[in-house]
Amino acid sequence: MKAESNNGYLKTSVIVEQNEISLGSGQETPATSPLQVTYGPRGSATTTVLQKHPGNRRKSLGITRATSIRRRGPANRQQLLGVLAVTLLATCLFILLLLALNTSRECVQEPRPNVCMTEECIRTAASLLSAMDRTAAPCVNFFQYACGTWNRRHVIPEDRSSISTFEVLANQLQVILKRILEEPPNNEDNNATLKAKMFYKSCMDIPRIREIGDIPLRKTLEFLGGWPVVVGPSWKPPPYSVEVLLGRLRGQYNEGVLLEQWVGPDDKNSSANILQLDQMQVALPSRDYYLKKSSESQLHAYHRYMTNIAVLMGANRQTAVEEFNRVINLEKQLANVSIPEDDRHDTSAIYRKLTLRELQREIPQLKWHEYLQEFINSPITEEEPIVAYAMPYFMQMGRIVKRTDRRTLHNYILWRLVMSIMPHMIDEYQQKRVEFRKILLGILSERDRWSQCVEWTNKKLGMAVGALFIRDNFNHESKETALEMIRTIREAFNELLAENHWMDNETRAVAKNKANSMNERIGYPEFLKDPVELSKEYVMLNITENHFLENVLAVLRYDAYHNLEKLRKPVDKDKWSTEPAVVNAFYNPNKNDIVFPAGILQPLFYSQHFPKSLNYGGIGVVIGHEITHGFDDKGRQFDKDGNMMQWWNNVTVKAFRERAQCIVDQYSRYKLQEVDLYINGKMTQGENIADNGGLKQSFRAYKKWVSIHGEEPLLPGVNLTHDQLFFLNYAQIWCGSMRPEDALTKIRSSVHSPGPIRVLGPLSNSEDFARAYDCPPGSPMNPTQKCNVW
């Protein structure tokens, strides 16, 4: 509920944690057992074998060969050059003979297919072929067919939990941002871009960070009344309530503990900003880590992590162990009373609008006025309207707080702030975090410092970084192309809408109106090109070159201020809610807009040199995916103006739910054998519906383009039609693999299905795919029973 948009085409936190390491051509892959995805009724399933990641062992056979050539003596080099010259001459003669032979036969042969032989086409064909496993049967396992070689040649780096084409693109983007942020200040810079460069520079200044140490963190904890576990037996509760402490964390450090709070559009009145409350996000990736016996090792690692950090700050180890046992018990209780995410998809069912007086009456265990007034500058009255999304949780949480001693509460509340700061710490603190993440995510080491600093700068000053990025790294023609593709894909959606027989005519007409009313945001907001307006964005943010941790704390205060200042102001529906330099896309239900940042308008998704089949199979499917989000299990609850209301009649709602349940059941039968877990089809249904709808709409739009412009020349050496290339490029977006620990985390906490499932699920539902690859009915990729919503 906290974000104004859906979770994006791909969860961002996965992207920014990645890097690419590729094995040389011809390299042997360490023998491993394959990662298996099974599909079928639970307990009895057919098995689809997917290539398991070969691990972190790297052999560089290609490099070895090159080195041996460079070490040859002069005589050997001359001999080698002679052999190469003869070989080249023979090859040229062979090609000339072939050309002559083909020319002589032109009068008797049928016309050959039109093949594109430009440099761009050759490069594109080579890229597609280099990822494929041509020995795999496309109608049995299209993921292996499309991605088998890519997965075999790309190892998961030690500092990553997964590797994928998405993540490789994000890493390429990071390299560009690194170069931009390291450029000296120049005449084109403004106050905002200078702050971004200063933040990055302070992040890279390790000697200065080491000199300052953890002093800013210690001062912060002291300001908040002291961390009891570190202060020791002499700690006394501060002369203010727990609610005031929670309010200070929210207002000063943008940290939500025990509950989440933000200011945003009212779901039932999207033009008005309102105070909103929701249940807390637990410290570990999902509530399951606290409640399932199978996660005891991760929970123990979490306890060890918090203990080690407290000891580094001066706590007695034995005391810390005992006190954090009580903290873990508290967080277990909070996790237990929280509502599972897959039970929160019906926004209208959990939405509750009430006044502060009503909230206080229904949840009397908490002093709500004290909490809110601590971080809201203007007076709060008992009539202040509030939207709450977790009333049952608040009731239970209030009771837990009442029966928990102040020392344990303060230990937990301040630990959550400390934990959020830990990624920015170095040396011993960093090492303890690495040890924890090794157990939780399988990550064996920390990333390069520059990569971390680029990520943090882009996250914390995203618009300033975006302004730097678009100067020289964004092809403005791609914006016009994307707009045209959005138009054609929206037309395809409306055609499919007209053809479906489960909606009544009135609802269908309203749905078409909503689709046509969607606003599209492509590339970046226009104000990034206006230095004065851009500088206003960060006028309240103070950044210095040589105080990194102080800068981090300043950004947290700025983020809190930036959000809270919207209270009682009308919603700016033209304002972007994401930074431009990110490989992702979004749909915002309260604004009914689709957002495609500059970072995603690059290969594999889009290139001006790609044939249309690849662009429609790439960014086209992304466009269709985001359009479909307006009509998935959550988006369908909002009208064209972004207001939550019932604009479907009951018969149509029932028909939708039946089709959505088909998707839920289908995806719930996919099982990742390596972690022995099924996909949560209920939690991932919105993204799965969008994947299926986006694929169908984009292919229809592509075929309409072909009917107008004709077939494009084929790509050389691939031996695939453009219909086949459309689906191949879609699948190769999802090439990748992940560690078992990461697979477990994603299944438990992510609204997105893992990459292989995002290939196998939509394609096995697609009649267009089955025709393109001539898959027999009943084959794994062309089952007789298919699911279809949009």
What are these language model-derived features?
Residues 170, 327, 333, 353-369, ...:
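Intrinsically disordered, low-complexity linker/terminal regions across diverse proteins
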Residues 176-488, 525-527, 537, 542-559:
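Noncatalytic, helix-rich "gating/capping" subdomain that lines the substrate-entry/channel surface
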Residues 1-54:
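Intrinsically disordered, low-complexity cytosolic terminal tails
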Residues 48-90, 301:
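Helix-loop boundary elements of multi-pass alpha-helical membrane proteins
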Residues 145, 278, 597-599:
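Active-site-proximal beta-strand/loop segments in catalytic clefts of secreted hydrolases
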Residues 131-153, 288-312, 502-505, 685, ...:
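Hydrophobic/aromatic-rich, well-ordered segments within soluble, folded domains that form packed cores
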Residues 159-181, 317-337, 615-621, 723-727:
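Short secondary-structure subsegments characteristic of cysteine-rich extracellular domains
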Residues 81-172:
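Signal-peptide-cleavage-adjacent N-terminal segments of secreted and extracellular proteins
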